[in-house]
């Protein structure tokens, strides 16, 4: 197994949130043309790689992390041809582009889900996780009830508009609707995501930062089965796209790199929202610093924010 693409060894990333980065057509929303216009600026900062937040077609119920079409650029940002031009212009300046891959769920407007929620059986009936009956909604899972033509509730990963894709269950606790990871329909989900990756790599993308990379297989506490899926993806990259990078949002480098085969893990410190801790922090009662009763506790803020290395002194 190749350790990592050479360019990743000295990559300095600049994150771009497309909708607020640079608007060139006056509609109040950033666009691909705006990103292209700022490539020299990005390079002037010493950055030689860009992590581009989701740019796919989406109803934007979750900032683009609810994908309606993985193979189409959202019209608010431009076209597929515009994105290819961004790849080309960035490469001319020695800048790599990582797209944000969202493999754990889609929008509830994705064509796969529109087919899956029908009563009639199709190749997409098991693309998402449905129970057998609308009366079956185990409390340990996030389920949306009574919204589909078919009899059953569907699992979501986060918001109600983000149905979870079905990569199977490592531990089967409800055999009437939970599929094992080696079920053909679960394997088909993984292959569909590989197909998405190939689509953009063939157009010039340099790899992917993977959103919620550890969320694929359910009832997989040690992430053994999830890691196996990513090993398969890594094998595909090493064989077909050896210069492409695979970067995880996992926050566990041991599992992400050593077990799952990612080249790198974005390690995020989930300290919460500093503003909330000032005004409405309530993990153990009202401990906000500015508690209206004068009983605020500054420790939560001072421990995690005031001592941070980037805090001005």
Predicted regions and their residues:
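Short loop/turn hinge sites at secondary-structure boundaries
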Residues: 116-120, 261, 281-286, 292, ...
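Structured alpha-helical segments in the cores of large, soluble enzyme domains
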Residues: 193-205
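S-adenosyl-L-methionine
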Residues: 215, 289-290
């Amino acid at each position: 197994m190749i350790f990592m693409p050479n360019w990743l060894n000295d990559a300095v990333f600049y994150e771009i949130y497309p909708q607020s980065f640079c608007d060139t057509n006056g509609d109040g929303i950033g666009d691909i043309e705006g990103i292209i216009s700022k490539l020299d600026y990005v390079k002037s900062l010493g950055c030689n790689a860009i992590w581009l937040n989701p740019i796919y077609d989406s109803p934007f119920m979750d900032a683009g992390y609810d994908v309606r079409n993985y193979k189409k650029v959202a019209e608010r940002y431009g076209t597929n041809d515009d994105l290819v031009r961004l790849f080309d212009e960035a490469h001319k300046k020695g800048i790599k582009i990582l797209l944000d891959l969202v493999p754990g769920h889609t929008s509830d407007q994705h064509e796969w889900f529109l087919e899956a929620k029908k009563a009639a059986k199709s190749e997409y009936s098991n693309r998402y996780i449905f129970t057998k009956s609308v009366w079956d909604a185990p409390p340990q899972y996030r389920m949306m009830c009574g919204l589909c033509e078919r009899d059953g509730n569907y699992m979501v990963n986060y918001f109600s508009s983000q149905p979870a894709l079905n990569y199977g269950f490592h531990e089967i606790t409800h055999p009437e609707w939970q599929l094992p990871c080696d079920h053909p329909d679960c394997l088909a989900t993984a292959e569909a995501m590989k197909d998405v990756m190939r689509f953009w790599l063939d157009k010039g993308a340099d790899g992917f930062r993977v959103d919620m990379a550890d969320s694929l297989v359910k009832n997989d506490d040690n992430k053994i089965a999830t890691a196996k899926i990513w090993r398969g993806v890594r094998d595909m990259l090493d064989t077909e796209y050896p210069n492409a990078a695979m970067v995880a949002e996992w926050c566990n480098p041991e599992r992400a790199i050593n077990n799952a085969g990612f080249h790198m893990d974005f390690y995020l410190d989930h300290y919460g929202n500093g503003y909330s801790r000032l005004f409405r922090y309530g993990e153990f009662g009202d401990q906000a610093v500015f508690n209206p009763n004068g009983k605020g506790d500054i420790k939560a803020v001072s421990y995690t924010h005031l001592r941070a290395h980037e805090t001005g002194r």
